[in-house]
Curated annotation (Swiss-Prot):
Region (Leucine-zipper): 62-69
Record gene name: crebl2
Gene3D superfamilies xrefs: 1.20.5.170
Subcellular location: Nucleus
Gene Ontology annotations for the cellular component aspect, listed alphabetically: nucleus
CDD domains: bZIP_CREBL2
UniProt keyword annotation of Nucleus present: yes
InterPro entries per the UniProt record, alphabetical: bZIP, bZIP_sf, CREBL2/REPTOR-BP
Lineage per the UniProt record: Eukaryota, Metazoa, Chordata, Craniata, Vertebrata
Protein name: cAMP-responsive element-binding protein-like 2
Protein family membership: Belongs to the bZIP family. ATF subfamily.
Function: Probable regulator of creb1 transcriptional activity which is involved in adipose cells differentiation. May also play a regulatory role in the cell cycle.
Alphabetical GO biological process terms: cell differentiation; positive regulation of D-glucose import; positive regulation of DNA-templated transcription; positive regulation of fat cell differentiation; positive regulation of lipid biosynthetic process
Pfam families, per the entry: bZIP_2 (PF07716)
Amino acid sequence: MDDSKVSGGKVKKPGKRGRKPAKIDLKAKLERSRQSARECRARKKLRYQYLEELVSSRERAICALREELEMYKQWCAAMDQGKIPSEIKALLSGEDLKAAPNQVKHRAVKTEQKEKCP
């Protein structure tokens, strides 16, 4: 026997390897392809919606932080002039610990931040 046709005691048959190609219904194959493309587009749409929402929420967070920074800058400028802002006095005296910073944030928004953050 020829060494190329014998491996491990088994005789190889000449011919094609693997599964025999079945007669594939071309219409069914085309429909599966279309369905797969539809699903792919739907997944892509969901992914982009998620990313847009994520960007939007991050932009809102950035605006809120800019507003807070502006508020603190105003407080620092007032203290540099020797004035103590009423909000800081309220915080130091313990009056409305939760209400004072929120009120100041709204005032800071009305000054310069409307132009920067939509």
